[in-house]
Amino acid sequence: MRIGVYICHCGLNIAGVIDVSALEAMANELEDVVLAREVQFLCSDSGQEGIIKDIKDNKLDRVVVAACSPRLHEKTFRHVMEKAGLNPYLMEMVNIREQCSWVHADDPQMATQKAFDLIRMGVAKARFLRELSATNSKASRNVLIIGGGVAGIEAALNLAEAGFPVTMVEKESTIGGKMALMNEVFPTNDCSICVLAPKMTEVQNHPNITLYTYSEVTDISGSVGKFHVRVKRKPRFVLEDKCKGCVDLCSGVCPVEIENPMNYGIGKTRAIYMPIPQSVPQVVLIDPDHCVGCGLCQLACPAEAVDYEQKPEEIEFEAGAIIVSTGYQLFDASRKKEYGFGKYPDVITNMQLERMLNSAGPTGGRVLVPSTGEPPKSVAFIQCVGSRDKTVGNEYCSRVCCMAALKNSQMVKERYPDTDVTIHYIDIRAAGEMYEEYYTRTQEMGVDFIRGKVAEVYSGEDGRPVVRFENTLESSVEEEAHDLVVLSTGYEPTKAAEGIGRMLNLARRPDRFFASAHPKMRPVDAPVSGVFLAGCASGPKEIQVSIAQGSACASKVMQLLGTGELEADPMGAHVDPDKCIGCRTCVEVCKFGKISIENKKAVVDEVSCYGCGDCSAACPVGAIQMRNFENEQILAQVREATAHKSQCPFIVAFLCNWCSYACADLTGMSRIRYPTNIRVIRTMCSARVNPEFVLEALKGGADGVLVAGCRMDECHYIHGNFDAKKRMDILKEVIKEIGLDPKRLRTLWISAAEGERFSNTINEFVKELEEIGPIGSEFKQECAVPGVEEVTQ
């Protein structure tokens, strides 16, 4: 066996902390390593070409790359292996950046020791790597787009024009999202519906797009290439194929008046109504909660489109890929009770002002004080309502509110030049193209800006709202009465997104929006293969960014499904029939139904296997294994880690690829430090962790073992972490029976976005193990640890 080890400097990202030259020297002494080399940037063209040359010149048959996270560049180096004529799965990546140099910059010596331990573990696994080959399977070219806002519309049209069939599902009765309700859009002040309506109509008329409005996705199963989707179409009580959109005939005779849901509590409509004049589709609907069933609209409809007996409709179809563009919802301003929204009629939200400014809105484009019905002489905007606010659980900036307030203040000044307009802000964030100029223009129009937080809004003696605020530039606390107070409410994830997230096992960020696979390198990829994120589904952003992301998602889908075939990941489960005893344990464990019994032996559908490894951990005889994460490969890593115990307490950690390993990466990207006592072994799912791995680690001398996976109900393999928890809970009892402290085994269920929590857990675990004592101290044994200097020199 001839193994090559490559250690990346990554500029100073690694070499600024770790002694890379020492790593090279130590790696050269390892068994089966015929070449170890340090390189400035391994991912560069020259770095990759160097590896290819070395493989050919030195007849290398295995490669270990010590660099950044495999979640970032594993594919890159697998392509390098292919170019060099080797099987791409004969390469192992070792993470010495995100999980070493970036988190241990305060201890270069132990960071170097840890990096060498990780390289040794990588070499140990590399000895057992096998050649793997991918298989191709047919994929549906149909694309599901969840959400018909501007991001979803852009993605749909891009894909449809490229010949892909698209199914768009929108929960509201019209597509267009929030943009369709706005008056104008910054920084160009274009009429919002004027630029959006043609695209909305194009979606409806495009032969490659199937549109389901007033509908919701109720279930998604399957995987990339063959997602099985179930959609529920809610009854409009109006037949879409018959309705002509002549709303005045039916709505005009309706005796029931209701609040128009599109106007955010301002303005009325009838129980049978058209959401907005430019609705797509141009079909009215009946509000079943308020309709009295008088039958007048049915009598008035010349097309006989009204159908009181209409029932919900279930639709099922397959999709090869999914674009999640679920948008956002506005913060409920009534949660900030000190601002009086819902209590004082003249305190409104920015979106209510948008609807007033819209000529098709409830006031015909006039800004009116709700209590008087007259134009205001004084307007105050209060920024960051529900954003940058720990008291409501939203510490993040909603990114758009500042510019939206600037735009609407301009609109007010243009229509009412004599009206005084004031914006109370913490910081004005105007960082986009033409934004600073827009901010300057707003100032030049006479809008006043007061920096400082608003303490409260209360009703003055004359009934006008009074704003009590701090002015940090004047170092004063002041009060001022206004005719109208506008709250710039922040963005939050939609409630509908919660269900979609559960169906697709999508990770969430601390702000509760969906997390992408990598915030810089893969901003529109979800961690789940075949799923992409567009627009505000992944956080607050401007319209132009949402459009760009919609196009980016479409491009990703075209690349994925362009040939109509998918290359199946070979890292699934496989059965050794000579070992299999036909006990059916794996069949019962596999929640995806990918294992069956044929001729008293387990058989895996390897093309559609999800690759979680739950079955492998459950198999009582080791007959079923996970390719690239086989028992002997992982045990080799465990034994190598514990054979060179360089710290006490010493922790072996098994982290799942999707959440806990990604969380450890994020901890590094955030430069959040934790002790060097941990050695990480990556698995695809926490369910892959065989109790044998834990016992082997403790037997080898590890003082503690951490098994970490996704948060409960958020496992990327649905039930994987539940099974892992059951096994580890049982194993703790076994450890206790052996005579060891069961606290030596710790479990952690964490999202990919909880870096602080991950760091805190490691710190707590180290302290707890220090109190318990070294492994075996329960039997009065001492911990023998060679000096760090002895190991690293």
From Swiss-Prot:
Pathway: Cofactor metabolism; coenzyme M-coenzyme B heterodisulfide reduction; coenzyme B and coenzyme M from coenzyme M-coenzyme B heterodisulfide: step 1/1
A GO term, aspect molecular function: oxidoreductase activity
Record GO biological process: methanogenesis
Induction summary: Induced by growth on methanol or acetate.
Enzyme class per UniProt: oxidoreductase
GO cellular component, one term: cytoplasm
Record-listed FAD binding positions: 147-170
Compartments where located: Cytoplasm
Cofactors required: [4Fe-4S] cluster; [2Fe-2S] cluster; FAD
Domain 4Fe-4S ferredoxin-type: 233-264, 282-311, 571-600, 601-629
Binding site residues for [4Fe-4S] cluster 4: C590, C609, C612, C615
Primary site of residence: cytoplasm
One Pfam family per UniProt: Fer4
Residues binding [4Fe-4S] cluster 1, per UniProt: C243, C246, C250, C301
Subunit structure: The ferredoxin/F(420)H(2)-dependent CoB-CoM heterodisulfide reductase is composed of three subunits; HdrA2, HdrB2 and HdrC2.
Family the UniProt entry places it in: Belongs to the HdrA family.
Name used for this protein in its record: Ferredoxin/F(420)H(2)-dependent CoB-CoM heterodisulfide reductase subunit A
Native species: Methanosarcina acetivorans (strain ATCC 35395 / DSM 2834 / JCM 12185 / C2A)
GN (gene name): hdrA2
